[in-house]
C-alpha cells in the first residue's frame, strides 16, 4: 500500500487490526466481519512503523507477549519463542533489552512478536524504511520467506517503488481516502 505522507495509510492499518474504530463501514478480513472484534481476536499480526518495543521486556518477553496475553501455557510459549528466535535469527539476543539491539534486530523482534500467535494476516508499517540497504535486502528476503512458509497474507506500507516491486504481488495506492489498485 502506497500513498502520500499523511494520507492515512497508518490509520487504515490501525483500523484493520482493531487499534482504531472506523467512523463508518466495516472491516472484513478473510471473508469475516471483524469490525467489532477485539484486536487479539482478529487473527492479525501488526508491525508498527517504530517497532513499538516494550522498553523493560527482553527479546524473549517481547516474542512471548501475545501468547501470554492469550494465557497460553508456559511450555507452549517457550516452544514458540524458540521457534521464532531461530527462524528470525535472534536466538542469541533472547536476554537483551530493546535499547541494546540494532535497527535490523529490532525489526526482526517486532516481526517475531507479530507472528507469535500465528496470524493469517500480517500488517507491516514501513518495516524497512529505517534500515541500510544490506539490512533492507536481508529483511525483505526474510519477509518473503515468512509469508511463503506460513501462508500469510501481508499488507505492507511503503514509500519505495523498489520495495513494492520486490515484495508485492499487488500494489495499491491510498488516494483521497480510497484504496485503488495501481496498473502493472
What are these regions (language model features)?
Residues 17:
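Helix-to-loop junction immediately C-terminal to a conserved catalytic motif
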Residues 33-35, 75-93, 144-145:
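Conserved ABC ATPase "signature" region
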Residues 33-46, 69, 74:
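ABC ATPase NBD coupling module
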Residues 97-101, 105:
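Conserved ABC ATPase signature
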Residues 116-120:
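A short, proline-enriched helix->beta-strand linker immediately N-terminal to the Walker B motif
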Residues 122-126:
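Catalytic Walker B motif of ABC-type/P-loop ATPase nucleotide-binding domains
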Residues 151-157:
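Conserved H-loop
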Amino acid at each position: 500500500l502506497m500513498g502520500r505522507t499523511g494520507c492515512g495509510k497508518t490509520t487504515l492499518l490501525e483500523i484493520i487490526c482493531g487499534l482504531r474504530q472506523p467512523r463508518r463501514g466495516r472491516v472484513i478480513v478473510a471473508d469475516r466481519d471483524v469490525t467489532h472484534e477485539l484486536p487479539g481476536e482478529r487473527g492479525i499480526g501488526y508491525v508498527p512503523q517504530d517497532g513499538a518495543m516494550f522498553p523493560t521486556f527482553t527479546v524473549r518477553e517481547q516474542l512471548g507477549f501475545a501468547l501470554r496475553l492469550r494465557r497460553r501455557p508456559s511450555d507452549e510459549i517457550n516452544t514458540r519463542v524458540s521457534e521464532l528466535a531461530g527462524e528470525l535469527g535472534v536466538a542469541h539476543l533472547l536476554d537483551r533489552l530493546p535499547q541494546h539491539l540494532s535497527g535490523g534486530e529490532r525489526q526482526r523482534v517486532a516481526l517475531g512478536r507479530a507472528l507469535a500467535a500465528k496470524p493469517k494476516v500480517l500488517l507491516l508499517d514501513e518495516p524497512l524504511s529505517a534500515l541500510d540497504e544490506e539490512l533492507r535486502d536481508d529483511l525483505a528476503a526474510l519477509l518473503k520467506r515468512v509469508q511463503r512458509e506460513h501462508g500469510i497474507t501481508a499488507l505492507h506500507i511503503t514509500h519505495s517503488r523498489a520495495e513494492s516491486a520486490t515484495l508485492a504481488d499487488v500494489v495499491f495506492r491510498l488516494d483521497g481516502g480510497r484504496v485503488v489498485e495501481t496498473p502493472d
